A protein has these predicted regions:
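Surface-exposed cleft-lining segments at the edges of enzyme active sites
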Residues: 93-98, 102, 142-161
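Serine-esterase "nucleophile elbow" of acetyl-processing enzymes
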Residues: 1-72
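A short mid-domain helix/strand-loop element embedded in enzyme catalytic domains
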Residues: 124-150
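Single conserved hydrophobic/aromatic residue that forms the stacking wall/gate
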Residues: 159-170
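A basic- and aromatic-enriched beta-loop-alpha substructure that forms the phosphate/nucleotide-
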Residues: 67-111
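Short catalytic/ligand-binding loop motif for oxyanion handling, primarily in non-cytosolic enzymes
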Residues: 31-34, 86, 129-133
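Alpha-helix C-terminal capping/helix-to-coil transition sites in glycosyltransferase folds
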Residues: 116-117
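Structural motif
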Residues: 21, 120-122
Length: 170
């Protein structure tokens, strides 16, 4: 007796090899897949900005990586918990601006050097909801538990999501 449905998939012409370079951007799914690939000795760069869920944050992270952006103190904000970037996961936060900037710029520099040599780029989007700062309209990748009154929340339509993200490659 068979207790599961078996699905036969055709073999792909192109397969990921251990010698390939892989970069992943996006949600916790990208993080988990990337960590599994690393555990199995694949050459991966996983989420250079940390986990990002919405398509616009992922697109902006890729744009910043391609342009070799360097962060400075004006790109950060400070609260009682330390220094943070709205574009980065909390793992990049620091007790000082210098500590936070060192983590961000070191990681971004590695990703910027790696991206042009990448054979596979994997992108996962976790939500169509986008948060932006009310004060300047900039999309954020992480709210860092800041008050919701600082942000505007909006739902991206399918056409707008695909159109905006496709601009990454133009």
């Amino acid at each position: 007796m068979n207790f599961r449905t078996q699905v036969e998939l055709p073999k792909e012409e192109t397969e990921i090899r251990h010698s390939d370079r892989i970069m992943l951007f996006g949600s916790c799914f990208a993080e988990n897949i990337g960590n599994l690939l690393l555990a199995n000795k694949f050459r991966c760069d996983v989420n250079p900005f940390g986990i990002l869920y919405n398509p616009l944050s992922v697109a902006e992270a890729i744009r910043q990586t391609l342009s070799y952006k360097t962060y400075n103190e004006a790109d950060l904000f400070c609260d009682r918990a330390g220094w943070h970037s709205f574009m980065h996961h909390g793992s990049f936060s620091g007790n000082s601006a210098e500590e936070c900037l060192l983590r961000i710029n070191e990681r971004l520099g590695r990703a910027a050097a790696e991206l042009p040599q990448t054979d596979w780029l994997m992108i996962t989007w976790g939500t169509a909801w986008v948060y932006s700062l009310k004060e300047n309209g900039k999309v954020v990748g992480n709210c860092h538990k800041q008050p919701d009154k600082l942000f505007t929340r909006r739902l991206r339509s399918e056409e707008r999501r695909v159109g905006k993200e496709c601009q990454i490659w133009c």
